Amino acid sequence: MARGKAKEEGSWKKFIWNSEKKEFLGRTGGSWFKILLFYVIFYGCLAGIFIGTIQVMLLTISEFKPTYQDRVAPPGLTQIPQIQKTEISFRPNDPKSYEAYVLNIVRFLEKYKDSAQRDDMIFEDCGDVPSEPKERGDFNHERGERKVCRFKLEWLGNCSGLNDETYGYKEGKPCIIIKLNRVLGFKPKPPKNESLETYPVMKYNPNVLPVQCTGKRDEDKDKVGNVEYFGLGNSPGFPLQYYPYYGKLLQPKYLQPLLAVQFTNLTMDTEIRIECKAYGENIGYSEKDRFQGRFDVKIEVKS
């Protein structure tokens, strides 16, 4: 038994290193060199094919614009102040209750101050009235960075913060700022005039993507009260000269056009659900994404 065990151990040792044939694990040094060389060449070729494929693919991709945009969803519509539960609840006589909302608006509007838009090499005036989309060439680096349209805070009227630092919250007339999320190369198409006949509040303008805020539910519609809109040219929507957006590489200082909405006569001590919606031929809505082309927010002004 012991002799058989010793013989077995000897055979394993001999397999690991055979001193007679100079073999390690059954192969000579030359054999090991050849097999290692084979695998180095084999995996080197695989790596070369992989890297070559990636390089060819990268040649078809622009760093300035996606090659395929047919499946990009229409832009979302969002509001400031940005709140987690989309609920705004405050007491006009209690500054602490609306302090967070005001600070959120102040921080967002910092980049829209005149002092932040003085560089004429970056910013340019695009007019005080809505106009057609402003094309700035192809999506490449040949012309360098593209200029950006200025947007003046004064266009936001009562919601600009220039005359009322509480943006209406102190008076129980809250403001929200609405923006259309950035989508590279997107040019809004306003709805046709006849499609707005069911929305008497909205006036047709071929150079404005209109937005309307109303009560979400039937029981909310009579509680919303008067709604005032403030934007470029006093238009309730987004002017087209701020589009298309050329991306962070070509327009790092891009400013989205804003629309301010003020609710001046909300029913007190009532939670009101309000829906704000953009209207356009290429604006879509989705039940899976509640911010695609629209959003709703609950507002309660407590006494």
UniProtKB/Swiss-Prot annotation:
It is a single-pass type II membrane protein. The chain crosses the membrane at residues 35-62. The modification Phosphotyrosine is found at residue 101. One of its GO terms (cellular component) is sarcolemma. Residues 63-303 are extracellular. Residues 191-303 are annotated as: immunoglobulin-like. The keyword Ligase does not apply. This is the non-catalytic component of the active enzyme, which catalyzes the hydrolysis of ATP coupled with the exchange of Na(+) and K(+) ions across the plasma membrane. The beta subunit regulates, through assembly of alpha/beta heterodimers, the number of sodium pumps transported to the plasma membrane. Plays a role in innate immunity by enhancing virus-triggered induction of interferons (IFNs) and interferon stimulated genes (ISGs). Mechanistically, enhances the ubiquitination of TRAF3 and TRAF6 as well as the phosphorylation of TAK1 and TBK1. Belongs to the X(+)/potassium ATPases subunit beta family. This is Sodium/potassium-transporting ATPase subunit beta-1. The lineage of its organism: Eukaryota, Metazoa, Chordata, Craniata, Vertebrata.
